């Protein structure tokens, strides 16, 4: 018989939210791309960018490109919600657009953007993520 244990579920959600915060802080804000292996499964799938990211090495390459284009990037988590093995975060990003990124030529201007990520955990690592980022600010 399966029983509902709200304490167990709450503790898992809290753990996943903690991992999500550490993931953003270490990978993006502290620029520790090699730490990705501590947060992501080897077959991570990151959906929502122009090109889908598949696998740990692709993810690290994608982050390196982001950090190259926006070297002073700082992400602040503004909201987070968790349910079972998923966490959603709403974030704000502040950066300077120093190098060409996607189809956007470098402007050398400071900007602020916002986005949402849904992170799906397998065990204690992120297996899949969906991201939606307001890229329109780069066209201004």
Annotate each PLM feature.
Residues 2-140:
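C-terminal and inter-domain tail/linker signature
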């Amino acid at each position: 018989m399966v029983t509902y244990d709200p304490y167990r579920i709450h503790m898992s959600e809290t753990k996943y939210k903690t991992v999500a915060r550490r993931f953003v802080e270490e990978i993006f804000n502290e620029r520790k791309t090699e730490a990705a292996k501590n947060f992501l499964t080897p077959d991570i799938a990151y959906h929502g960018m122009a090109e889908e990211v598949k696998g740990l090495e692709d993810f690290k390459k994608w982050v390196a490109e982001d950090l190259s284009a926006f070297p002073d990037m700082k992400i602040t988590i503004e909201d987070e919600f968790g349910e079972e093995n998923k966490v959603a975060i709403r974030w704000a990003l502040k950066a300077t657009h120093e190098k060409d990124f996607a189809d956007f030529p470098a402007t050398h201007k400071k900007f602020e953007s916002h986005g949402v990520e849904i992170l799906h955990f397998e065990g204690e690592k992120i297996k899949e993520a969906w991201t939606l980022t307001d890229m329109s600010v780069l066209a201004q």
